[in-house]
Amino acid sequence: MNQYKLPDLPYDFGALEPHVSGKIMELHHGKHHAGYVKGANATLERLDEARTTEQFDRIPALERALAFHLSGHILHSIFWRNLSPRGGGEPAGELKATLERDFGGLPAFKRQFNEVAASTMGSGWAALVWEPLSSRLLITQIYDHQSNLNQGGVPLLVLDAWEHAYYLQYQNRKADFFGACWNVFNWPDVARRFEAARKLHVDAA
C-alpha cells in the first residue's frame, strides 16, 4: 500500500521569523502535520482490515477519520509552500488581474480573506480556491480540515486558523498572526497553482 509521507519544509524552521517563530514551525511541522500523515496511513490500514474481515460497520467512522487526517495533510503541504522567507508584496500578472476582477481589488480581497480566517469558529482554514465550473476565484472557510468545502474548488492559497499555528507566539491575537502572514505569502507559488488550476475543466452538462 502506498504511504503518505511528511514533506520536508522548503526552508529552515526559523526562516519566517519574526513573522512566524521557528519554534512554532518546528512543532507545527514535526508534530501536528506529522500526526496527520501518521493518522491517514493508519486509517488506510484499518480500512483495508475492515474490508478484509468484512467489518463494514467500521467503515463510516474510518471514512470520517480519513477525511480529517488526509485533508489536514494536504492543506499543510500546500501551506508550507504558500509561505516563503522571500515572500510578501503583491501578486502579479494574470493572478492579480483575476483577483481584482473577482473581488473588486486587492484591498477588498485581503480584507475578505482576513475576515474569513478571523471568523473561523474553533478550528479551520481560510482558502482561496479556483472554482472551475464558473472559472472564478472564491474564498472559502473550511471547518477543521475537511468540512464546508466547495466541491471541485482547487486550493491556491491557504491560511491555517487552528490555534497550534499561532498561539505560542501570538496567544489570543490571531488577527495579528493573519496580518503577519501577508509578509511571507509566496505569490509565485500561488500563481503557479493558479495557472495549473485554470487548465481544469468540469463538465456539468
Where do the PLM segments sit?
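Feature for soluble, non-membrane regions of globular proteins
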Residues: 1-205
